[in-house]
């Protein structure tokens, strides 16, 4: 019985991450799946979507939740479609960065309460999914075992951080922005489900603080994750799991992407102490409800020519449109009542740039500059940004 359980766990783990990464295609598949798992863990643990919007998969001793399409939760279905658009840009090596942001006013998606930054780098051999690490000198010698180990560590970091952050407001919405390597991206390119967006920055509703989560390298890709959240949500986080490089963090000037220069001024998230405490209190590393039977299609199944276990019908369901307005309520992991909403993007109230600037001056809120360059010429040149056709 124990042997069968071990085989089952190993088999399900292999469905998430391949055991071997020796080609660019295998690396691309791995990065896509790691992105899917990361987004799923974040949205699950932050209580963004109700329980039914997730399936279950296993990574060694970790039980993780994977976002899936749910007709009763249009918001999760919409995020699945966004992810498919991200995969398209990633496969073409255009994608530079994803900003997944949480906001509270459905009519003002530019004023955010929390955001997650996923940054991608591509080596000469292919792309890399990078979660911020000091060890960036041995990418060419990265083994499959090293990559898998780093991936599981990253997921554990996400798990610990998300569980210890203060709760989000009860009713929240999601938006996403995509940034590109403009020098190689065609000027008219837009991923499926996206349109031309605003590159002027977003307004942070509160006092932001910035966390480096980690990095996962492969021989072909690098993926990096950072989290920006309200300072007050950090109050319950034990200082022992934060390793600040500079105790005087300039909260009033948070830059979303200035390569690695700003990393020296941000907190690194260290989970060793917290994980040891949790392991002492519990003999399991399960995120939640490991006994759920998940037979539905998951967002990780993003390739059209996947294995025979994935039917064409499932793929079509993943990319099918969900256009109606629907509201559903469910108790989330934090005990809040969550309303899952999806509103057609054309029905969203639009706030003019002049009104936004005026409101910003009056409220004293912080502007998060998405991109900043030391080159004046680069600043004058408008960077291309994509945003979803429809918001959740």
Swiss-Prot record:
Its main location: nucleus. PROSITE patterns: HORMA. Phosphorylated at Ser-375 in a SPO11-dependent manner. InterPro entries: HORMA_dom, HORMA_dom_sf, HORMA_MeioticProgression. The modification Phosphoserine is found at residue 374. Transmembrane segments: none annotated. A motif (Nuclear localization signal) lies at residues 381-384. Interacts with HORMAD2. Interacts with IHO1. Plays a key role in meiotic progression. Regulates 3 different functions during meiosis: ensures that sufficient numbers of processed DNA double-strand breaks (DSBs) are available for successful homology search by increasing the steady-state numbers of single-stranded DSB ends. Promotes synaptonemal-complex formation independently of its role in homology search. This is HORMA domain-containing protein 1. It comes from Rattus norvegicus (Rat). The gene is Hormad1.
